[in-house]
């Protein structure tokens, strides 16, 4: 057997929650390119169906399943539907997650409860239903990959999100210890700030500071996670469990944003923020390249960065 064959997922059956867009979509496409048949699970039926169709266009079997991960009955029905079409479940990527921004001294309990329900409880409900299926099938085995965050390790000034993701990391370790006897590997991946629609409205000054704090030199993109997902889904990680794999370009090696973010003058105008949002949503294309802001694509925002950080020609 070639060592490269350890990463081959042909014949494996996978599901990805939150698989319609962003990180989840990238994970679903990466698994499919490695050979796995993939169920795209999401509340967004239109985007989820589009991602599933994109996978099928590559000659790989795919399905879309709608599911609210906070509802145990829906989660159980989702796993049953995946198995009804695929026959078994080998790989599960639990990616569904949300963030609600706001000052922690002002956030209401409803917002807190919603974030914890999706990010932590939803991850547990999915992992539980997935493990039950993996235990029932023959051979008894499986790979469960939870998507956590660097915010589980460093304070990110968003208590509900940070706490929920820290919970995901420890949940992963606990389930790994419990389910190893069933030959189920449970691991998690902790990305940095990733350029996805969920983060489209993050202020430009904050984004540029994130880039500066990332030793590998660019704000993280969904494709930066693909290798880690394939590794943890494949036979290459058969003796790896309980791991929190930090995939952040080295960001957590540096200080986080709290003092800098609050001390940088707000020199990006509302008009420039509007232009940024349109770019980030794909109307005019992402305004970033490997070096950060691309002045050829977005000259007015590049000028705003220069002003905010005192850059001189």
Segments from the language model and where they lie:
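Substrate-binding pocket helix/loop in short-chain dehydrogenase/reductase
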Residues: 103-104, 108-116, 199, 210
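Catalytic loop of short-chain dehydrogenase/reductase
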Residues: 145-167, 172-181
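C-terminal substrate-recognition "lid" of short-chain dehydrogenase/reductases
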Residues: 218-247, 252
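Short C-terminal tail/terminal secondary-structure segment
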Residues: 2-5, 241-313
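Short, small/polar-rich loop/turn modules that mediate ligand/substrate recognition or access, typified
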Residues: 93, 180, 185, 240-242
